Amino acid sequence: MKNTTNTKRTKFIFVTGGVLSSLGKGLAAASIGALLESRGLSITFQKLDPYINVDPGTMNPFQHGEVYVTDDGAETDLDMGHYERFTNAVMGQKNNFTSGRIYHTVINKERRGEYLGGTVQVIPHITDEIKKSVRQLDGSVDIAIIEIGGTVGDIEGLPFIEAIRQLRGDLGRDYTLFIHLTLVPYIKTAGEVKTKPTQHSVRELRADGIQPDILVCRTEVPLEENIKAKIALFCDVQQDAVINCVDVDSIYKLPIALHAEGLDSKILELLNIWTANPNIKPWQDLVENIQNPKNEVTIAITGKYVDLTEAYKSLHEALIHGGLANHTKVKLRYVSAEDLESGDPDSYLKGCDGILVPGGFGRRGVEGKIKAITYARENRIPFFGICLGMQLAVVEFARNMAGMSEAHSTELEPNSPDPVIYLTKEWFDYRTNKIQRRDENSDLGGTLRLGAYPCVLQQESHAGDAYGTQEVFERHRHRFEFNNDYRQQLIEKGLVISGTSPDGDLVEIVEIEDHPWFVGCQFHPEFKSKPMQAHPLFRDFISAAVANKKG
């Protein structure tokens, strides 16, 4: 009898960080995934975040940065974006867990009596739930790369460190690998690097029961072999397991840099895996493209969170990808929408080859964004509006082209006499084949139209030309929609509806007639763009910007 049991066992790489935060664990993990994938291995990722929020969906972008949305509607950490951009892995609900989500699950189990009246504790109940979350990935791929958020030594991260310590015992050394990312600072006045922070970070990790197998040392300058030998001696790792990660001027150079240091080879050696030689030529070609652009354009991003560009991380990268597809260097000019409200648009936007208004929530800076849209429309500058940016493009058009001077969104002006954008209280969910319902009293968290939905395109439109197909799936994160009561009236004034839901009820893409390139989309195309495969709308937006610059 044929055995149909899936016997594949996944090997796990755990990535921790020390010394300080924002060292780039997510990019390091993504680069490791890219290198392993280039050797023919199947990979996936998981991010374990120590904060108590259930997910980042309701967190302030100034504190957390971007909320990255997956196809299945998960609101996740921005590192999910790095994972998807660098590899073919598809992220979802099972790829991002927070302390809040773990504790929520455990408390619900306790309320249901699943612990049979026992005392619920961090060990074993919380750590067991963390391990269960990690082991969901077992058997699905060759390698799962698990990033532990925060910094070793943080009190809130201790349950996760303890859980992965236990997992080594549960799974065995052949199936687990610990990589620790640290900082080796360069003291310019002394002209030397200092290894002590790395030594102390590893000591902290070892005190929690974990001996790292590989150290990835972030530095400003290359490490000499004697420095690597010193780190290896004091941290009890092999010298060729001390990987120098020198700062690079483009994140897309990182896989090549880590490969040159032998990181992927060392990982395979320690996990006892044999593979084909890596194919890193696509990354080399990408870097060649980055370093030798044929054109240069300036794109203005008129937004609310311009003081923290991490809030627009995927947007930033997608514009770079659009540039790469056109062999063009993209310079970004972040313009505060609040400043624009009281300022002259010409002083902020003059000289820009394209204008983009991104998504966001709340009324702060809204009139500044509308002024930017008017400037793009009147001056025939390529314009791209995303989510709220698309909604405000409709508002601007209704006000200035259709005679509705008080047109607005009910999110921003509930008593508007012409609510061209309004709260959608029900819609058809094509993933579940059910009607979804929301109202003004619904919780903020997890109640938006989230995840991938189909969009049917109108041919002979900018969107139709960009995609070159009839139907696409794009990711959403919003509550408010185009009000169909105004559809015909706006179409008669020159608004083009070039994308809708399959039933035609939900407006997904709008354009305007007689403009070189003016597109607004209700979804977030930036979440599906990759450096080697730019999203079609970003590709064509940058192409239009290049044409605009050339006149």
Swiss-Prot record:
Keyword annotations from UniProtKB, A to Z: ATP-binding, Glutamine amidotransferase, Ligase, Magnesium, Metal-binding, Nucleotide-binding, Pyrimidine biosynthesis
GO cellular component: cytosol
Top EC category: ligase
Positions annotated as active site in the UniProt record: 387 (nucleophile), 524, 526
Annotated residues for binding of Mg(2+): 79, 147
PROSITE patterns according to UniProt: GATASE_TYPE_1
Region (Amidoligase domain): 1-273
Family: Belongs to the CTP synthase family.
Protein's name according to its UniProt entry: CTP synthase
Originating species: Desulfotalea psychrophila (strain LSv54 / DSM 12343)
